[in-house]
Amino acid sequence: MQTEAMVLERHGGPEVLEKRTIDLPPPGPHEVRVRVHAVAMNHMDLWVRRGGPAFKLEYPHRLGCDIAGTVEELGARARGVLPGDRVMIQPGLSCGICKACLSGHDNLCRRYRILGENAQGGYTRHLNVPDENVIRVGDKLSFAEAAALPLCTLTAWQMVFRKAQVKPGQTVVVHAAGSGVSSIVIQLCKLVGAKVIATTGSPDKAERARAIGADDVILTSEQDYVSEVKRFTGKAGADVIFDHVGGELFERALTAVAWGGRIVTCGATAAFLAKVDLRQVFFRQVEILGSTMGSKGDLLEALPLLLDGRIKAKVDRVVPLWQAREAHEALENRTVFGKVVLSVD
């Protein structure tokens, strides 16, 4: 069949995104065809579009890893869903047979791929995906809300529970409160019973961070980051710091974290390189933990919290897919709090 999509044929700015008619084969034996209704944006969309040595794309390439829609057709041996089901898509693809996959750590699979990054993504009306990646959500979430949750929830769940192992009463710092991942991290940490300090450069985003549970907000455009963390913690420093900014802010986190504390990093939206004074690490026994995505099981474990509203998607705006260029510009300009969602009419 043919369907419409936003694709790129080369790396570059938002202008490389073009609306095209593409061919889509029938779903494979263990695949499901989904009619896409919403696809949420991530910084990954910007990185892949801009290009770099890590991205080897098959053109025309479709961005978009966070997808929600309805099941249209099943492959011959597909199971778990039925035509008409409202679903979200788990964005991580793995081999399913290696030691990591079989032990429930599929995001450590050496053949791991992410929709929209190194596999064709959801900037399209229709998409074929493995049946094991399709999760029914019923009618408790809008398509925009369902699309806004998968990658952020996976990432936040692994950071909070698998890596940092946040406990009641601990003080945590969450960088870049306006991001989708950070908004989920804040909510999860509050559910655990932790005290949350968020950072942002915008007074408007500071108020929104408080609205979703942050106990204090450091306005990095006006306040000294380390001094404010020390003030809030009685000079002890934060038990856990969650970072996906990188660069200078990561460097300063090494001074703001408590003795024996943990820094969990899942990205570097500002800068990939940071200078690390190893004395701060070994002498103060600071743990630096890397984190990418989460397992399929993590999303299923988080699902009840998503469906009953204890964890809410923060959707800043909904934009038609065919206006993806404008949506990319908004995300690049950092004028959003939470997620930009592309609707597919």
Please place each PLM-identified region on the residue numbering:
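Cysteine-cluster motifs in flexible loop/terminal segments that predominantly coordinate metals
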Residues: 93-126, 130-131
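Short glycine-centered segments of the SAM/dcSAM-binding site in methyltransferase folds
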Residues: 86, 171, 195, 261-262, ...
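Glycine-rich beta-strand-centered segment in the early N-terminal region that forms part
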Residues: 23-39, 52-102, 138-140
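Rossmann-fold dehydrogenase core element
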Residues: 259-266, 275-315
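Mid-domain Rossmann-like dinucleotide-binding core that forms the NAD(H)/NADP(H) cofactor-binding site
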Residues: 141-223
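Glycine-rich cofactor phosphate-binding loops and adjacent beta1-alpha1 units
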Residues: 197-203, 207-285
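C-terminal hydrophobic helical "lid"/dimerization subdomain
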Residues: 1, 9, 296-345
